[in-house]
Amino acid sequence: MKFFAVLALCVVGAIASPLSADEANLVKSSWDQVKHNEVDILAAVFAAYPDIQAKFPQFAGKDLASIKDTAAFATHATRIVSFFTEVISLSGNQANLSAVYALVSKLGVDHKARGISAAQFGEFRTALVSYLQAHVSWGDNVAAAWNHALDNTYAVALKSLE
Protein backbone atom coordinates (compact mmCIF):
# COMPACT_ATOMS: atom_id res chain seq x y z
CA MET A 1 0.00 0.00 0.00
CA LYS A 2 2.97 2.30 -0.45
CA PHE A 3 2.90 6.04 0.03
CA PHE A 4 -0.27 6.71 -1.92
CA ALA A 5 -2.16 4.85 0.73
CA VAL A 6 -1.94 8.02 2.76
CA LEU A 7 -5.05 9.06 0.83
CA ALA A 8 -6.86 6.79 3.21
CA LEU A 9 -5.82 9.18 5.90
CA CYS A 10 -7.95 11.82 4.34
CA VAL A 11 -11.18 10.25 5.37
CA VAL A 12 -10.85 9.09 8.90
CA GLY A 13 -12.06 12.31 10.40
CA ALA A 14 -13.50 10.63 13.44
CA ILE A 15 -10.57 10.57 15.80
CA ALA A 16 -10.09 13.75 17.83
CA SER A 17 -13.21 15.55 16.68
CA PRO A 18 -15.54 13.27 14.75
CA LEU A 19 -16.89 14.29 11.38
CA SER A 20 -20.56 15.03 11.34
CA ALA A 21 -22.75 12.86 9.14
CA ASP A 22 -22.94 15.75 6.68
CA GLU A 23 -19.15 16.12 6.56
CA ALA A 24 -18.67 12.39 6.05
CA ASN A 25 -21.20 12.45 3.23
CA LEU A 26 -19.38 15.35 1.57
CA VAL A 27 -16.07 13.47 1.72
CA LYS A 28 -17.70 10.30 0.40
CA SER A 29 -19.58 12.00 -2.41
CA SER A 30 -16.55 13.97 -3.57
CA TRP A 31 -14.38 10.83 -3.44
CA ASP A 32 -17.01 9.00 -5.50
CA GLN A 33 -16.43 11.58 -8.24
CA VAL A 34 -12.75 10.61 -8.62
CA LYS A 35 -12.26 7.12 -7.22
CA HIS A 36 -12.18 5.64 -10.71
CA ASN A 37 -9.36 7.98 -11.76
CA GLU A 38 -6.72 5.91 -10.00
CA VAL A 39 -3.92 6.47 -12.51
CA ASP A 40 -4.59 10.20 -12.77
CA ILE A 41 -4.60 10.63 -8.99
CA LEU A 42 -1.28 8.87 -8.52
CA ALA A 43 0.23 10.67 -11.52
CA ALA A 44 -0.86 14.03 -10.11
CA VAL A 45 0.83 13.28 -6.79
CA PHE A 46 4.04 12.17 -8.51
CA ALA A 47 4.03 15.18 -10.85
CA ALA A 48 3.62 17.62 -7.98
CA TYR A 49 6.14 15.90 -5.71
CA PRO A 50 8.79 13.77 -7.45
CA ASP A 51 10.30 12.98 -4.05
CA ILE A 52 7.17 10.92 -3.35
CA GLN A 53 7.63 8.99 -6.61
CA ALA A 54 11.22 8.31 -5.54
CA LYS A 55 9.89 6.39 -2.52
CA PHE A 56 8.34 3.76 -4.82
CA PRO A 57 11.17 1.40 -5.87
CA GLN A 58 9.40 0.26 -9.03
CA PHE A 59 8.91 3.87 -10.20
CA ALA A 60 11.94 5.66 -8.73
CA GLY A 61 14.15 7.43 -11.23
CA LYS A 62 11.76 6.87 -14.13
CA ASP A 63 10.08 9.47 -16.27
CA LEU A 64 6.45 9.79 -15.18
CA ALA A 65 5.23 9.89 -18.78
CA SER A 66 6.95 6.57 -19.48
CA ILE A 67 5.37 4.75 -16.54
CA LYS A 68 1.92 6.34 -16.33
CA ASP A 69 0.38 4.12 -18.99
CA THR A 70 1.94 0.86 -17.82
CA ALA A 71 0.09 -2.05 -16.29
CA ALA A 72 2.30 -1.88 -13.21
CA PHE A 73 1.38 1.75 -12.59
CA ALA A 74 -2.34 1.12 -13.13
CA THR A 75 -2.29 -1.94 -10.89
CA HIS A 76 -0.52 -0.11 -8.11
CA ALA A 77 -2.75 2.95 -8.36
CA THR A 78 -5.86 0.77 -8.31
CA ARG A 79 -4.67 -1.15 -5.26
CA ILE A 80 -4.06 2.08 -3.39
CA VAL A 81 -7.30 3.79 -4.38
CA SER A 82 -9.26 0.64 -3.47
CA PHE A 83 -7.76 0.82 0.00
CA PHE A 84 -8.83 4.44 0.28
CA THR A 85 -12.30 3.58 -0.88
CA GLU A 86 -12.55 1.00 1.89
CA VAL A 87 -11.49 3.49 4.54
CA ILE A 88 -13.82 6.15 3.17
CA SER A 89 -16.73 3.74 3.30
CA LEU A 90 -16.05 3.20 7.01
CA SER A 91 -15.97 6.91 7.83
CA GLY A 92 -18.85 8.76 9.43
CA ASN A 93 -20.02 5.84 11.55
CA GLN A 94 -18.93 5.80 15.19
CA ALA A 95 -19.19 1.99 15.24
CA ASN A 96 -16.34 1.89 12.70
CA LEU A 97 -14.04 4.26 14.56
CA SER A 98 -11.75 1.55 15.97
CA ALA A 99 -11.39 -0.09 12.55
CA VAL A 100 -10.52 3.20 10.88
CA TYR A 101 -8.12 4.09 13.69
CA ALA A 102 -6.38 0.72 13.32
CA LEU A 103 -6.04 1.12 9.55
CA VAL A 104 -4.62 4.63 9.81
CA SER A 105 -2.27 3.71 12.65
CA LYS A 106 -0.93 0.76 10.67
CA LEU A 107 -0.54 2.98 7.65
CA GLY A 108 1.59 5.37 9.68
CA VAL A 109 3.72 2.56 11.09
CA ASP A 110 4.20 1.01 7.64
CA HIS A 111 5.20 4.34 6.14
CA LYS A 112 7.62 5.05 8.97
CA ALA A 113 9.36 1.78 8.07
CA ARG A 114 9.65 3.04 4.48
CA GLY A 115 11.27 6.28 5.56
CA ILE A 116 8.31 8.52 4.79
CA SER A 117 8.56 11.85 6.60
CA ALA A 118 5.90 14.08 8.08
CA ALA A 119 6.85 16.62 5.40
CA GLN A 120 6.03 14.10 2.68
CA PHE A 121 2.67 13.43 4.28
CA GLY A 122 2.13 17.18 4.04
CA GLU A 123 3.15 17.19 0.38
CA PHE A 124 0.72 14.40 -0.30
CA ARG A 125 -2.05 16.34 1.40
CA THR A 126 -1.33 19.37 -0.75
CA ALA A 127 -1.32 17.32 -3.97
CA LEU A 128 -4.50 15.49 -3.04
CA VAL A 129 -6.40 18.66 -2.19
CA SER A 130 -5.23 20.26 -5.44
CA TYR A 131 -6.42 17.24 -7.40
CA LEU A 132 -9.77 17.22 -5.64
CA GLN A 133 -10.30 20.95 -6.16
CA ALA A 134 -9.74 20.51 -9.89
CA HIS A 135 -11.83 17.36 -10.36
CA VAL A 136 -14.82 17.39 -8.00
CA SER A 137 -17.65 19.73 -7.15
CA TRP A 138 -15.67 21.85 -4.68
CA GLY A 139 -16.98 24.53 -2.39
CA ASP A 140 -16.29 25.84 1.06
CA ASN A 141 -18.33 23.04 2.63
CA VAL A 142 -16.40 20.31 0.80
CA ALA A 143 -13.08 21.99 1.62
CA ALA A 144 -14.02 22.21 5.30
CA ALA A 145 -15.06 18.54 5.40
CA TRP A 146 -11.82 17.37 3.79
CA ASN A 147 -9.72 19.63 6.04
CA HIS A 148 -11.49 18.30 9.12
CA ALA A 149 -10.93 14.72 7.96
CA LEU A 150 -7.30 15.39 7.06
CA ASP A 151 -6.56 17.14 10.34
CA ASN A 152 -7.96 14.24 12.35
CA THR A 153 -6.30 11.62 10.21
CA TYR A 154 -2.90 13.25 10.22
CA ALA A 155 -3.00 13.44 14.00
CA VAL A 156 -3.14 9.63 14.09
CA ALA A 157 -0.77 8.91 11.21
CA LEU A 158 1.89 11.38 12.25
CA LYS A 159 1.84 10.03 15.79
CA SER A 160 2.78 6.67 14.28
CA LEU A 161 5.77 8.30 12.59
CA GLU A 162 7.26 9.36 15.93
Swiss-Prot record:
Residues 1-16 form the signal peptide. Keywords: Heme, Iron, Metal-binding, Oxygen transport, Signal, Transport. Pfam families: Globin. Residues 18-162 form the Globin domain. One of its GO terms (molecular function) is heme binding. GO terms for cellular component: extracellular region; hemoglobin complex. CDD domains: Mb-like. Gene3D superfamilies: Globins (1.10.490.10). Heme b binds at residues 76, 111. InterPro entries: Erythrocruorin, Globin, Globin-like_sf, Globin/Proto, Mb-like_M. Homodimer. There are at least 12 different components in Midge globin. There are at least nine genes for VIIB variants. Belongs to the globin family. This is Globin CTT-VIIB-7. The gene is CTT-7B7.
